[in-house]
Amino acid sequence: MTSPKDNQTAKPVCFQDVILRLQSYWAAQGCAVLQPYDMEVGAGTFHPATTLRSLGARPWAAAYVQPSRRPTDGRYGENPNRLQHYYQYQVIIKPSPPNLQELYLGSLAAIGLDPMIHDVRFVEDDWESPTLGAWGLGWEVWCDGMEVSQFTYFQQVGGHDCRPVSGELTYGLERLAMYVLGVEHVMDMPFNPPGSPIPLSYGDVFRQAEREYSRWNFEQADTGMLLQHFKDAEAECDRILTAAETDSAGRRIPMAHPAYDQAIKASHLFNLLDARGVISVTERQAYIGRVRALAKRCADLFVTTEAATLQAEDAA
C-alpha cells in the first residue's frame, strides 16, 4: 500500500475529478476498482460486492462508484443538495485493516481536504440497514461541520455475523464535491473541467432528469403495476432459492446472486411505492420485513456456497 501522504494534491476542479482521484487513491491501496452494479439500488451498500462479499472468510478489497436512487428524496432539481438520483463512492475491505482511519484521512487529502488544515471529526453513529438485516459500529465523518462520509465496521449482514469484520466507507459524492469545490447548489457544480471544449455543469447533465423522475416518483408511477412487480420479484427470489442446487449437467451451482438481484428489485419497488404514498405506517414495516427476509435467505445461500467451495479447495 502507498502512503496517504503521497496523495496530497491541489484541489480538484470538477465533480468527475473528485471521482477519478478517489479511484486512483483506493487503487493504490490495493482495492479492486469495480464498476457500478447494473440495477436500481438505494445505496452503494446494496452492491453484492459489499453485501454478499462482506460475508464469509475470504479476504476482499473493492472500491466503486454506485449510482443510487431514493425516490422520496426527489425535489424536482430545485433543492441545493437533495436528489432522488445521486452517486456514492463505496470502499469495502475484509478483514478491516488496522489503519483504515489513516487510509480514509489520506483519501480526503487526495481530493484536496488536508486533515491538518480542516476540522475532521468522527461522530459516533452506528449504521443499520433494516432491509438488508445489516448493522455495524461506526461514525459519521464531519469536515468543518458538514457530514461527508460514513465509516462503519460491519457486525452483521443478512442476519449473519461478519467474521472477519469488514471495514466500509461510504462517501456522498455530490455533497463532498460541493464542499471541495466551494459550490452552494449541486446543479451549479462543474461536472467536467470548466476549461473543457464543452464545459458541463451537474445541472446540464441531470437537471431535466431530476425534474421528470420527481414527477414520476410522486405522481405518475403506476402503483398497481408496482405492487404486482413487488410480488413477482418476491416470488422469483423464492423460486430461485428453492431450486435444485444441481444443474442439468449435474454440476452443483446454487444461485445466490440471481436471487439477490430479485431482492434488490423488491427493495427498489418498495421505495417507489413509498414515494407514491400508498403504503401505510403499518404496511411499511411489513414490506421492510419481507425484503429483509429475502436478503437473509440470499445471504444464507451465499455463506453455505462459499463454505462448500472453501472446503473443496482445501481438499484438493
From Swiss-Prot:
It catalyses: tRNA(Gly) + glycine + ATP = glycyl-tRNA(Gly) + AMP + diphosphate. GO terms for molecular function: ATP binding; glycine-tRNA ligase activity. It comes from the Bacteria. Its EC number is 6.1.1.14. One of its GO terms (cellular component) is cytosol. InterPro entries: aa-tRNA-synth_II/BPL/LPL, Gly-tRNA-synth_heterodimer, Gly-tRNA_ligase_asu. The keyword Lipid biosynthesis does not apply. Keywords: Aminoacyl-tRNA synthetase, ATP-binding, Cytoplasm, Ligase, Nucleotide-binding, Protein biosynthesis. The keyword Aminoacyl-tRNA synthetase applies. One of its GO terms (biological process) is glycyl-tRNA aminoacylation. It is found in: Cytoplasm. Its main location: cytoplasm. Pfam families: tRNA-synt_2e. Gene3D superfamilies: Bira Bifunctional Protein, Domain 2 (3.30.930.10), Class II aaRS and biotin synthetases, domain 2 (1.20.58.180). SUPFAM superfamilies: Class II aaRS and biotin synthetases. Tetramer of two alpha and two beta subunits. Belongs to the class-II aminoacyl-tRNA synthetase family. This is Glycine--tRNA ligase alpha subunit.
